[in-house]
Amino acid sequence: MRLAFMGTPDFAVPALHALHEAGHEIAVVYSQPPRPAGRGQAVRPQPVHLAAEALGIPVRVPTRLRANHDEHAFFRALDLDAAVVAAYGLILPGAMLTPRAGARLNVHASLLPRWRGAAPIQAAILAGDDESGVTIMQMDEGLDTGAMLLTGRVALTPATTASTLHDDLAAMGGRLIVAALANSETAAIPQPAEGATYAARLTREDGRIDWTRDAVDIDRQVRALTPWPGTFTTLDGTVLKIGAATPIDGPRDAVPGTVLDDRLTVACGQGTLRLTRIQRPGRGMMEADAFLRGQPVPVGTRLGS
């Protein structure tokens, strides 16, 4: 098939590679424009942009698609069989949704209609879901509301992190989009209205730890929001990022946020949480024992106050 591929972050790269390896003609790749990244804030192309260039595929990086009539005309002139979207980050206007049946496909990292929106991987972990997955859906002008073609499922465990789930679902998305294009007879199933939920775009403030919450919920927050936007608390006014933690049994009458022992076990609203990976300003993420050698934290210290 002659395709356009639209994607931006690392999540979309396996789908691009899978389509290329399956022998599809990828006429053009759309990605969001290069942006500052890393400590030096150097302007860098997005991961999909780099992957497409490595494959020798032309790349377009418009800053907007709505009311971009020149881009609409270019897109129509491509004479595509299908357009595949995976975490592109811009909503396609109607003028860029090719009318061919089954040819407007999106790779979405959730079991729709649960977790439509921008952050489905993190939302599934935050909510304590038992499973997540990938849905291949036909695109319409709604937000992840189109009819579903294929789904793949993966179980979530108390050890699942956003990073591990991201990689599992990215690989699954590549396999499923190739399968969807190979079987044009797959029936599209409209999404049910019941069970629809939305995963809002994350902000840095979503990572602030509220120690009055249950230890299990805070553990989910750490696993869901590492590396972005990261979970954090404060120690004497200094921001500490928390990279990993473990809920454990502990006293129920301690003030939330109180350090209970010399292993950085912290009282929560329900239960206790042992911090196992920590980062202070200007340093890399480190194990708790290494952190404590350079920054002793006395028993009774209050975090987040």
Curated annotation (Swiss-Prot):
Keyword ATP-binding included in the entry's annotation:
no
Task: Offer an example of a GO molecular function term for this protein.
Answer: methionyl-tRNA formyltransferase activity
Could you name the domain of life of the organism this protein comes from? Bacteria
Where does the secretion signal sit in this chain? none
What the entry lists under InterPro entries is as follows: Fmt, Formyl_trans_C, Formyl_trans_C_sf, Formyl_transf_N, Formyl_transf_N_sf, Formyl_transferase-like_C_sf, GART_AS, Met-tRNA-FMT_C
Q: Please state which protein family the record places this protein in.
A: Belongs to the Fmt family.
- Protein name in the entry: Methionyl-tRNA formyltransferase
Gene name of this polypeptide: fmt
